[in-house]
Amino acid sequence: MKKRALPIVIFVISLQQSSQSFAVLDLLDQLFHKILNLSSRSISCSNCLKHRLQIPYFCSLHKGLNTVHKFRSLRTFQQCHELSKSNQKCHLSVMTRQVLRSRIMRALPLIKESLLLAQFLQ
């Protein structure tokens, strides 16, 4: 299982260093969510065209593609949805791409160490 995770992480890092086009950023979003093992059930906001993340309690409202709002419950998600209807700013907590990247970077040494150990034990 861990052997499959490493190429994804390496791919994310190589994408970080390439041009930051919208397509690349969209792909990064998808990869980050897969790496963070988020649920696959979906709650989507029909009022926002930019909402592309079909993952519970995550919403890209108000901040476009650069940040995602992370919610602890369905209630806070619905509050954000209501704010979007009236075009108000959402003041809920935001998880930026930089936070997601730093989590992956911190996990890299552990992944590499696990792979080396697995190869040694084979």
Curated annotation (Swiss-Prot):
Signal peptide segment: 1-21
Keywords assigned: Host endoplasmic reticulum, Host membrane, Membrane, Secreted, Signal, Virulence
Keyword Secreted: yes
GO CC annotations on file: extracellular region; host cell endoplasmic reticulum membrane; membrane
Compartment list: Secreted; Host endoplasmic reticulum membrane
Chain positions of motif RxLR: 72-75
Domain of life of the native organism: Eukaryota
Membership in a protein family: Belongs to the RxLR effector family.
Function in brief: Secreted effector that dos not suppress the host cell death induced by cell death-inducing proteins.
Domain notes: Has the canonical translocation RxLR motif, but lacks the canonical EER motif, which characterizes most oomycete effectors identified so far.
Protein name: Secreted RxLR effector protein 80
Annotated organism of origin: Plasmopara viticola (Downy mildew of grapevine)
The organism's taxonomic lineage, starting at the top: Eukaryota, Sar, Stramenopiles, Oomycota, Peronosporales
